[in-house]
Amino acid sequence: EGLQHSRERARELLGIDPSVRLIGALGRLVPIKGHTYLLQAFAAIKDKYPATQLAIIGAGREESRLAAEIERLGLSGRAHLLGFRENALQYVRAFDIWTMPSLAEGLGLALLEGMSGHLPVIASNVPAMLPLIQGAGGLPITPADVPTLVAALDNYLGLSDEELKAKGEQAYRYLQEQHDIEVFRQEYLNLIDSGLNQARKEQP
């Protein structure tokens, strides 16, 4: 909790409009994270939800390809690649919906990061994550399947602010009950260390 900026401060630091609904993802920009499918799904519903934007925090070799995809899909100004951020968990509350469209996932730790920010979660139904998604009352999707991702986004974006917030609180309660926060924090700090080492390796 203490690690995270408020929604307003996080958005200010990231340069995101405080009034929009923000779909978020956090992770290395590599094919296995499935970001290209997230962009395609968002493109399919962007006109239905004009006050919604998408932001991805992370760096990686897919960055230029994802930037080109944003252009191709007509998402300029609506989808943002925010790059690598130190201690990315600080910015979780900038988002309103947490997405993890990964094609495969080892631990699914980033899913817990979203829950720690009181966010409703949409994530791939891979074995590491499915029990967490179900426990948190989130929406499981099929990896690399744009229609199921569109349906999940549409489901959450169709909710009122209060309903969406309630979904996020449900996810946070699950995290508190199932994953002791101190254990999670230690896992997270370990993740940060490995993430920073990885980022250093990936710098050109």
Language model features with spans:
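Short hydrophobic beta-strand element within catalytic cores of glycosyltransferases
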Residues: 120-123
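A short, well-ordered alpha-helix in the C-terminal region of glycosyltransferases
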Residues: 9-12, 163-177, 184-187
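Short acidic/histidine- and often glycine-rich active-site loop of Leloir-type glycosyltransferases
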Residues: 112-113, 126-140
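Conserved acidic donor-binding segment of nucleotide-sugar-dependent glycosyltransferases
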Residues: 135, 139-147, 155-161
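A conserved mid-protein helix/loop that constitutes part of the nucleotide-sugar donor-binding site
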Residues: 21, 25-44, 54, 61-68, ...
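Nucleotide-activated donor-binding/catalytic signature segment of Leloir-type glycosyltransferases, i.e.
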Residues: 67-83
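A short helix/loop element that forms part of the nucleotide-sugar donor recognition site in Leloir-type
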Residues: 1-16, 162
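Aromatic "clamp/platform" in nucleotide-sugar-dependent glycosyltransferases that forms part
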Residues: 84, 103
